[in-house]
Amino acid sequence: MKNLISLMLLLATAGSFGGELKPLRVGVSVDFRPVAFYVSDELQGIEVDFANKIAERLDRSVEFRVYQLDQLFTALEESEIDVIMSAISVTDERAARVRFTKPYMETGQMAIVRTEDATEYSKTGALTQAGLKVGVHRGATGEKFVRKEMNNPDVYAYPSVETGLGALRNSVVDLFIHDSTTSSQLTSSFVNDNLLSLNRYLTKESVAWAVHPDNPELQTALNLILADMIEQGEVQAVLKRWLPVVPVEL
């Protein structure tokens, strides 16, 4: 298995690196704790663990490159990176730009509210009332959900999650819609101790890695690695380490 994966990855990277086996360039966004985030100068998180496990199977190093979420796809298209590993939800729009691997996790959007408003927004129909001021992370699938599915909201799109949560803390918006993978972690931090994640999915989404559309060999190699990691129980172990809270199903 390891030799086959190494061969596939060598073929996938030969065109870009002139045949040399160089580090796998992994694009991440550090706005998504616990997906990828800094502790001092060290990157940690779900995707960091996965990337390192990939490297172990390939006897090669990983080069992490940090971007804003809405810059990741452009970086991939311009061959600045080889793969996006940033808890990316699979959508038809994104699939038109990249090749997705097989999914490794199911997730969804959740509402984050101020603690004093939690009872009100937990009521049936509270999130479907018209005219809510809703914060989102610009370019994330949460923004698409809010604009398409919510009832005529005033949408505030922020360049980072922390900026959006700051707006929620300061009552600029009524709630913030964000990915369940990181919502509970974000609201458990000291700075956000007056915020609460409503632990219920608003959507269901598949999460996968993304490679350049002209690189099917790398897609195949990563799918082989993913299958082996699932078989060995490593995917579930990583997710359990970083995601102790399981949201309520739709």
Regions found by a protein language model. Name each.
Residues 29-30, 106-113, 180, 184-227, ...:
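Periplasmic-binding protein-like
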